[in-house]
Every structure is written in C-alpha cells, then in structure tokens.
Amino acid sequence: MYYTRENHKRFLDKELTAISESYLKLLNTKAISLLASNDVYVTQYVKLDLKKNDIGADRNVLGSGQLMLRFKKDKGIPRKNEYFTAVILEKDMCLPKNWGDTTWGKLRSHQVEFSEVHCVWQGKTDDNGFLLCGFSGISLEMSQYLIDNRLEGCVIILGPQEPPMEYYQNLITVISNTSPDYPAKEILDFDKRNIVWNPERINSNSSQVDKIVAFLNSNNELVFQGPPGTGKTHLMAAIVARLITENKSVLVTALTNRALIELAQKDSLKEFLIQKKVKKTNVSADELISCKNICPVESKQITCMPGSVTLSTFYNASGWAKICYEEQPFDYVIMDEASQALFGMIAACKNLGKRIIWIGDQNQMQPIILLSEETLVRNDYGMLANGFQTLCDKFDFKSYILTESHRLLPNAASLTSLFYHTPIKSVADFEYQIDVNKLTFATQNGGCSLIFTEMPIGEKADRSCCSYAIDIIAEILSCHPKIYISVLSKFRTTVRMLQNCFVSRFGGLNNVLIDTVERVQGMTCDICLYYIPNTMMSMSLEKSLFNVATS
C-alpha cells in the first residue's frame, strides 16, 4: 500500500490540530477585539421571513424562511455568502458595554440559543444609518425559539463559524479500522501506480441513464468528471429518480447543503418530493419552505428506506460511515462535489453502500486545507488532501466525462476547454445579449476580456481600484439592469472592500453577487468580473481557481 493507516492518521491529526489551534485562537480573543475587526457583529433581530415575497423585490432574497437582521451602517456589514454562528445571549451579556475583557469563548458560555447562518442578501432600511441583511440556514430550533418567545427587536450576535472538527474526528475513526473485511479498505490501501485518465465522453441527457444504471447492475464503482455547466446535477437527479423507481435505497452526500437542495429541486425528483421519498438531514427553516415537501430526518440516525433518497453532507455522512460498515446500508451512494472531499471521505463512501458513484472535477476547487504547502509536500500528503484527484489517478474504475456545456456560449466553452483533455462543446439555448456598442470592453460573441488599470503593489484592498471595478459594474447595469453579475476575487479583504464600494453606491441588488471564488463553484451568472490585485498573483491565477472564476 502507498500510505499506511498510521501515515493517513498522522495527516488527519495534523490538519485537525491546525484547525483546532486556529479556532482556539479565536475563542481566546477578546470579543470586543473581534467586534472591532468585523469578525463579530452586534445586530438587531427584525423578523423571520416565513412567507414568500415577504420582502421587497429590490432585495436579494434567495428563497424564504430567512432571518432578517438590522446593522449599523458605520460598523460594516457581512459579505454575501459569509458564514457565522448566530448567538442569542443572556440579557446582561448581549451588549458590548458589558463584555469587558471577556473572550469570545467565554461569551459563548452565556448563550441561550445558537445556529449556523450565512448572509444571502443586503439592503437599505428606511432608517438613516442602518442596513438590513438576510440570512439563510437558521436551524428549526432557533427559529422556533425566536417565534415562541416573540423576540422581535432582541440582540443577536454574529461570530466566527465553528470549524468541522467532528468531521475530521469521524474520518480518523474511519481510516483507523483495520478489520480484514472492512469495505473502505479497498480504497484506503491502494498501491503506487499511475492510471491514464481516459474517461468516456457523454452528455447529460436523460437517455444516458439506462446505460449508467445497467453498468452499475454488474459493477460497484463509477466516476464522473463534470466540467463547469455540463449538467451533472441534472443527470444525477435523473439517476436518483430511476433508482427510486426501482425501489433502491439511495444516499446522496455533498460538501454543502446548497448542493443537496439544488438536487432535490430538480424536475426529475418533483414527484418523489410530493410522495415524501426525498429525505434530508439538518433541514433549515429556509430549506423547509423553499423545498416545502422535503422530509426532515434525524442526523444521528441512519435513515435508509427502499424506494427513497436520503440527502446528507460529508460532515454528517462521515459519522454514519464509522459505525455502519458491516451493513453497508444503502444500495447506492452518490457523492456530489467529490473534488472537495478528502481521500478519507472518498473511501468512507464504501462503508455506506454497495455501489458508489463519485461525481466531481479535478480541474476545479480542491478541499481547503490549513496545513502549509511545504508541510503537504515534505510529508507527501498531497494525495490524501486531494481525494478525487487520487481516485482518478490511482484507480482503474469506469469513468465518464460530461462534454456539453449548457452554461457557456461557444467562445467561452472553447476557452474552458483549455483546462481539459477533451473539447467542451456549447449547447447553450440562449443568445449573447451584451450590447458591444455601448460596452466597449465586451467581446463580440462572448468569452473573456482583459481590462488593465494601475494598481499599487502589495495592496489587496485599494479603494480606488475597487471603485474602478464597481464603475465597470455600474456601466454594465446602466445598459443591462437585469443581468446577473458576479464580482469575484481570491482574497476576503478584497471582497470586503468591493462590497463596501458597491453597497455604498447601490445598496443591495438581487442580481449582483460579490464573493471569493471558493464560495461560488457551480454558480451560474451572465457576466463575471474577476478582480486580480497586484499582489500574490500566483494565488489568483492558480489553475483550478482561475477555471472556476472564468467558467
């Protein structure tokens, strides 16, 4: 075997230590200092948006069941898609004047309720000096607490998101099991060899489902590579629908809840939603409303029923994988976003079911690792960190690549093809709508444009340069006010400045997103502006990051 289990455990231990130390540093920092650095926000609870169209159309409402909070404009606001732990504190501790030298960790000991949330829209209020922001992901428990106690107007503190330490602890348990008949053993104990990656080319049409399901009737593993916009979620939903029809039990696991909900909302699964055959762990208030027929299930209890699909994140499924290996309860396990899975999680799928489909793209974002590049190289941990890449390079499983892009027009598709060993063909069913006579920087038939400007060396968040980028967005909006635009950058500090420049001019718009590249993989928009500051350019131009940003 290439890696001993002890080597694998050492990698996970080191990464868990790095995560723990980083979070411990935050816990031991004075809460008032985190407030000053915009790592903590003091907000006022306005309401829970439990009805569709409950908010004006000028605000970016990505569904309903959202938590609406009021912010002081001069204190800054979160960036869209930024994740937090929302905390309700005991009365005396809800105001910063009572915090003194209290650390964030000590302040959390005064909480009466909490939930992970993330910001999905920003907008102006009628009150001078205040802004409204909307948050998705609030737990059903915290939602019920706010409603039952009629807490409109109370203070809610937003603080650092808790890291997935239990996920790493689960994977350590998974890879430490040395039982001779252990299902994950087949993946974990691979030998040193190189396989030529040569997947069969297919499209995402539903006609492919017969061939895929027939193959899985006599084989246990299948790997899909899905370049940007090639319809992998559409195809995955069609496969799941077929398996439910055949009375199979299916688990779909992904890194994010967003990916799972996108799958559940596909047309192929609508009938099964109504029949309560689509189940999900850790359903949030907004998910329960935007996907109203989804069936919430207990996260600690493995829910496996013939003729149904269970949706669960890596975080939760890893906990199941460490205890259910003797049964392999599911008939089929489908891992979405597999390119963002550690190798231990790739292997854990074998514990969960008898037949496995891994779907990812090794040319897009890899897992986020806190260990330094030097540590990864020196200890030869790269293959353990980039699990899907290792699966494609070291295992001779049947593989497919989706080669038709529904998202990109021909020029853009041909540029994206540069990242792949096979051409990506555009089958987009829309026309190029940009007025090149008014927007001189736009290309004639789509594709990429380069816009140069003077930038100070070493500055990630230069206000004048960020304002220039927003000027470009303003020019686009003046010609095409309804077009969907993403403004992306590698660095959080850059994104914060871009958001400040945008919000001060436009407030919150439902068709403009400003975020880091890492948070938007799989998203579709009409125009993407990728801002590359004049510092650490190798990071902004890293191959997989650049592919995501420009595709």
What are these regions (language model features)?
Residues 2-20, 72-217, 273-293:
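Pre-ATPase regulatory/linker segments immediately N-terminal to the P-loop/RecA-like helicase/translocase core
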Residues 270-317, 515-516:
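Inter-Walker segment of RecA-like/P-loop motor cores
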